[in-house]
Swiss-Prot record:
Pfam families: DUF150_C (PF17384), RimP_N (PF02576). The keyword Transferase does not apply. It is found in: Cytoplasm. GO terms for biological process: ribosomal small subunit assembly; translation. This is Ribosome maturation factor RimP. Belongs to the RimP family. CDD domains: YlxS_C. NCBIfam families: PRK00092.2-5. The gene is rimP. InterPro entries: Ribosome_maturation_RimP, RimP_C, RimP_C_sf, RimP_N, RimP_N_sf. GO terms for cellular component: cytosol. Signal peptide: none annotated. HAMAP family: RimP (MF_01077). Its main location: cytoplasm.
Length: 205
């Protein structure tokens, strides 16, 4: 797994975005999230428990706490009430991407290089649209995948352009859980240290 800096992640555009009503909601709430120091991962309307608006987000450092979810919910709820993009009663659900997260930005592929991912493309790539394997390298235009179960006659490695990507998600493994928990712990420790430093500066003024 590779580290990426907060600066590199700030305002980085998503490779995979919504359509229709989901896109309208995303356009409304994303500026609010950015101002708060969060990144939008995904918006999805679901018929679960009536009608549920699922908003997946994270801090620029990749962390997300229960308190963060509550903060985001309180911030975007009144904005959605004013803009009123949904003409039915719905339940707002804010969550983190989770360990087996959707991969929606180039930095996601860089950060989780070496881990297993499953993805779909909007066009045929190397004779198929569905892939599963390890991310072995990432460049400006796409990533290289080493298939863990190549079909007979297929090369194990395949290059997938970001422009062809329609969906991608990490596959849960023991290695992913270990690395994700380690990264989360480091990021939260760094944030706490930074907040303590800022508090000391304020006290000295």
């Amino acid at each position: 797994m590779s580290d990426t800096t907060t600066a590199e992640n700030t305002n980085e555009p998503r490779l995979i975005t919504e359509t229709g009503l989901d896109r309208r909601v995303a356009d409304i709430i994303e500026p609010v999230l950015v101002d708060m120091g969060f990144r939008l991962v995904r918006v999805r309307m679901s018929g679960q428990n009536g009608l549920t608006l699922q908003v997946m987000t994270e801090r620029n450092d990749g962390t997300m706490t229960v308190e963060d979810c509550e903060e985001v919910s309180k911030a975007i709820s009144p904005v959605l009430d004013v803009e009123d993009p949904i003409d039915k009663a719905y339940h707002l659900e804010v969550s983190s991407p989770g360990i087996d997260r959707p991969m929606v930005r180039r930095s996601d592929f860089i950060r989780w290089q070496g881990h297993l991912v499953k993805c779909e493309t909007s066009v045929m790539v190397d004779g198929r649209k569905r892939f599963r394997g390890k991310i072995v390298s990432v460049d400006e235009d796409g990533f290289r995948l080493e298939r863990d179960q190549p079909a007979y006659g297929e090369e194990a490695a395949v290059a997938i352009p970001f422009t062809a990507l329609s969906e991608a998600r990490l596959i849960l493994t023991d290695e992913l859980i270990r690395d994700a928990l380690t990264a989360d712990k480091k990021a939260k420790a760094a944030r706490a240290a930074n907040e303590n430093f800022e508090d000391e500066d304020t006290d000295n003024e």
